[in-house]
């Protein structure tokens, strides 16, 4: 009897676009040699909605509801970047109270985003319990958002020159109570997860990125800081009122999935410190500035000769973007979220280029998963933290 002949072929597997661990509509074409990954090709574009083109025929206020659909888990950051550009073009001074309110909202949004990263990341590698715990704290943040903005998600709260409404009565006390409660929650997560031997087996030494490699790929956010690069735009660019608070940049040297987890856990604690300081030191005064003070270059102005305009807040404003270009950026939960804005002396931007952190961080995925096991793809992709809304735009 002749023995059956065996063939050793590579196998091609489709992961996604409807797989639960793909975090949206990402499709990976994975080439396998047994359990080992030989090649991985991400296929993007399933959630492309033409966000950059839509911006070119909308005023800034009309465009604000659209931007919350990029990274729909950290909508305050997309709103912040959308109004920061026109503010810098128009030389609009933001009142101190409005700046403090913005910082509070941004840091609450950062915590909510990191929480909804942590739960699915743990579920991807087999730990179901934290997935239910994180919704408990995240629900409290959404209650705070709803009280201040009227919306739990897609808040539409930031405005050119300030915010849409002041903080309601009793909101500050409620937020301080949340901060005290949340610190005990983070301690609970660390006790449950950080020293868990099964968790450490799955993430330690998996998906290592060196510091030089991270810089060469243009990575940002926790991906960059977990590779030993101490770079945070809140410290570098000095935007809003971050310089007035005492906090530390969270970073690790190892560059693996565990380091990225530790950076994000540390960032949640630092965000609570920033929120507590902002709530205790929030000044009085207006929450918006509807006045533009800008040089009128056509009149050959003399020193201190400014053109004054008033922005109407409720309807679409007649606020013109002056004829210049500008790149603005903020430190979003996933990395550097930037806008390259070109004005054309019109109420519509001539060009609105989005620099999404998730799209650029995702580029390194094929390199990270090569020569790893199939099961490690979930760990590595989860540690990158992507949202397909901002990847595809």
Curated annotation (Swiss-Prot):
<dbReference type="GO" id="GO:0019684">
    <property type="term" value="P:photosynthesis, light reaction"/>
</dbReference>
<comment type="function">
    <text>NDH shuttles electrons from NAD(P)H:plastoquinone, via FMN and iron-sulfur (Fe-S) centers, to quinones in the photosynthetic chain and possibly in a chloroplast respiratory chain. The immediate electron acceptor for the enzyme in this species is believed to be plastoquinone. Couples the redox reaction to proton translocation, and thus conserves the redox energy in a proton gradient.</text>
</comment>
<dbReference type="InterPro" id="IPR029014">
    <property type="entry name" value="NiFe-Hase_large"/>
</dbReference>
<dbReference type="Pfam" id="PF00346">
    <property type="entry name" value="Complex1_49kDa"/>
</dbReference>
<dbReference type="GO" id="GO:0051287">
    <property type="term" value="F:NAD binding"/>
</dbReference>
<keyword id="KW-0472">Membrane</keyword>
<dbReference type="InterPro" id="IPR001135">
    <property type="entry name" value="NADH_Q_OxRdtase_suD"/>
</dbReference>
<keyword id="KW-0793">Thylakoid</keyword>
<comment type="subunit">
    <text>NDH is composed of at least 16 different subunits, 5 of which are encoded in the nucleus.</text>
</comment>
<keyword id="KW-0521">NADP</keyword>
<dbReference type="InterPro" id="IPR014029">
    <property type="entry name" value="NADH_UbQ_OxRdtase_49kDa_CS"/>
</dbReference>
<dbReference type="GO" id="GO:0016655">
    <property type="term" value="F:oxidoreductase activity, acting on NAD(P)H, quinone or similar compound as acceptor"/>
</dbReference>
<comment type="similarity">
    <text>Belongs to the complex I 49 kDa subunit family.</text>
</comment>
<keyword id="KW-0874">Quinone</keyword>
<keyword id="KW-0618">Plastoquinone</keyword>
<dbReference type="GO" id="GO:0009535">
    <property type="term" value="C:chloroplast thylakoid membrane"/>
</dbReference>
<protein>
    <recommendedName>
        <fullName>NAD(P)H-quinone oxidoreductase subunit H, chloroplastic</fullName>
        <ecNumber>7.1.1.-</ecNumber>
    </recommendedName>
</protein>
<keyword id="KW-0150">Chloroplast</keyword>
<dbReference type="InterPro" id="IPR022885">
    <property type="entry name" value="NDH1_su_D/H"/>
</dbReference>
<keyword id="KW-1278">Translocase</keyword>
<keyword id="KW-0813">Transport</keyword>
<keyword id="KW-0520">NAD</keyword>
<dbReference type="GO" id="GO:0048038">
    <property type="term" value="F:quinone binding"/>
</dbReference>
<keyword id="KW-0934">Plastid</keyword>
